[in-house]
């Protein structure tokens, strides 16, 4: 279990404290004579101009001469009209979530209409039965079927889809790691098709990248969702090439409403089983190899990174199938005996036994301090139920404080076995506020408000899903804590923009582009 408390870095911050230090005062007292002698020389008069300009640039930006503000890019590709919401604006988040759900539903239905026969052939007739049950268009024999059997069929169908997706991704990763001469005919075709998609994605990202303003944190935007999904899907399960509707595992699950059926019949919410439309490490690799060909090994790393998220989802579903469903069936039988319920139906009482609080769902949960809420907020990030892990990352932007800590797992109906290790969210939050209160950088009013906030529970502002694996999410959080250069780039602009940048860097990761600029050389007169 880890805990890290650090001061955040911003451009200009180190110079602000350096100008008032004792060492600086000694330098100022001796610099006059040295500068006078130097300026009298011929070389000195030519160099002074560049030196002064370099010094002014350094004082204004807080950089040493070898540093420069670079371009930072969040590693997600937004569809047209999308935007990362402000984490402290629940209304903004809710509106976006609802719009995305409607778009996804429409696109998934297209996949079902286009590939229905092929999907049934590959994954079995059970998918169609589950879909008909959810749509209320069930035939008599399906209507007479027990609800628990429909639930089992939905779980089994989802298991087949995730197994197939996992196998295909591993095949592609293995093919990419082989030498060209050692690949089979099928592997060669698979790699060639994937490379074509990467080239298309690279061209689209390159166009966006060239149009970006320098020295800004930005997202790559503007691709339509259909093109994006087709270009970024490593191995479509049905449909190939750059078709506008490819049957990805995510699309098949959505088209046949498997998660909705599982939720409707058992009360178990599986909306956290997600995979990124485009793997952030793919965007990072494309940006890294702008002017040259991307090696196969680098692509294999990205494929394996996405496969981690798929495997995590698969383990979660197996946990539900092997651990939770037998307990669910037992609870059903007990309730049937007590209440004398019909054998076919699942009583709502049984479902409620497997409901878990919203604040313990595997998502990024957002909280803020009751006072000075714009500056003081934190995220509680929870892993899948089978892993039972979580961490806390808190920010006080007014005094530039960040606090990261691994937390103990919560017990709930869907959780796996756990060890009593680590602290609770409340303990971490109180220590975070205690450290912020003791900081010498805070104003008197800010300190008073923090003391008041410490006596009450934080305000819960809702939650957001994350698409990457929990290990990658934790890696992104730790990079925000440790990487000074990243902090300098995300902590610029208005407060709401900084909060969005922090959330983007946590959910997707962030790539700093460009080489270091030699500022004095750049500013020196020819």
UniProtKB/Swiss-Prot annotation:
Signal peptide limits: none
Protein name from the UniProt record: Outer capsid protein VP5
**Where is the protein localized?**
Virion
A Pfam family cross-referenced in the UniProt record is Orbi_VP5
Q: List the disulfide bonds.
A: none
Task: Decide whether keyword Transferase is in the record.
Answer: no
Instruction: State its role.
Output: VP5 protein is one of the two proteins (with VP2) which constitute the virus particle outer capsid. Acts as a membrane permeabilization protein that mediates release of viral particles from endosomal compartments into the cytoplasm. Permeabilization activity is probably negatively regulated by VP2 and is triggered by endosomal degradation of VP2 and exposure to low pH.
From its record, what is one biological process in GO terms?
symbiont entry into host cell via permeabilization of host membrane
Similarity field: Belongs to the orbivirus VP5 family.
Domain of life the protein comes from: Viruses
Q: Name one GO molecular function term.
A: structural molecule activity
Q: Which UniProt keywords apply?
A: Capsid protein, Outer capsid protein, Viral penetration into host cytoplasm, Viral penetration via permeabilization of host membrane, Virion, Virus entry into host cell
Stretch list, region Involved in membrane permeabilization? 1-42
What GO terms fall under cellular component here?
A: viral outer capsid
